[in-house]
């Protein structure tokens, strides 16, 4: 039996954060992304979309919910590819976040960090080191 598949791509991820403006500023600086949209969300609360022309991260908050938002707890981390790992790490540290788990492996290099809401990110570069 033969099946026909379309080629998929990740169009967006939706993250619940405590301060969408703060998170959007981090991603603009870290990834060179731009704000694509902001406004009230369908489920109440507020959302900012930040990303490239092809994909984005929706940064959602519902201030009236109270307490941590538990949907999606199985998420391990989101990976972000950058050209300059050292510059990316400087952005993360300047934001007051703690990079950890540095590793050089084939075919790249990486580090991790948790944002202000406990969401883990992996920052990876496949560019050849300049030193």
What does each model-identified segment do?
Residues 71, 78-92:
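Mid-chain, well-packed structural core segment of small domains
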Residues 1-6, 38, 93-131:
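Vicinal oxygen chelate
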Residues 29-30, 91-95:
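Short amphipathic alpha-helices in soluble, non-transmembrane regions
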Residues 53-57, 64-66, 85-87:
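Short, charged/polar surface micro-motifs in flexible loops or helix N-caps
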Residues 44, 74, 107:
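Exposed loop/turn and edge beta-strand positions of beta-sandwich/beta-sheet ligand-binding modules
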Residues 58-60, 122:
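Conserved beta-strand in the GNAT
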């Amino acid at each position: 039996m033969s099946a026909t598949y379309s080629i998929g791509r990740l169009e967006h991820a939706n993250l619940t954060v405590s301060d969408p403006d703060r998170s959007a500023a981090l991603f603009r600086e870290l990834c060179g992304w731009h704000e694509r949209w902001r406004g009230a969300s369908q489920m109440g609360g507020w959302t900012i979309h930040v990303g490239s022309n092809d994909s984005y991260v929706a940064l959602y908050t519902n201030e009236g919910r109270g307490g941590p938002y538990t949907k999606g707890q199985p998420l391990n981390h989101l990976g972000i590819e950058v050209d300059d790992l050292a510059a990316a790490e400087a952005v993360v540290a300047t934001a007051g976040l703690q990079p950890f788990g540095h590793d050089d492996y084939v075919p790249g290099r990486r580090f991790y960090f948790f944002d202000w809401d406990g969401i883990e990110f992996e920052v990876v570069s496949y560019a050849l080191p300049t030193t």
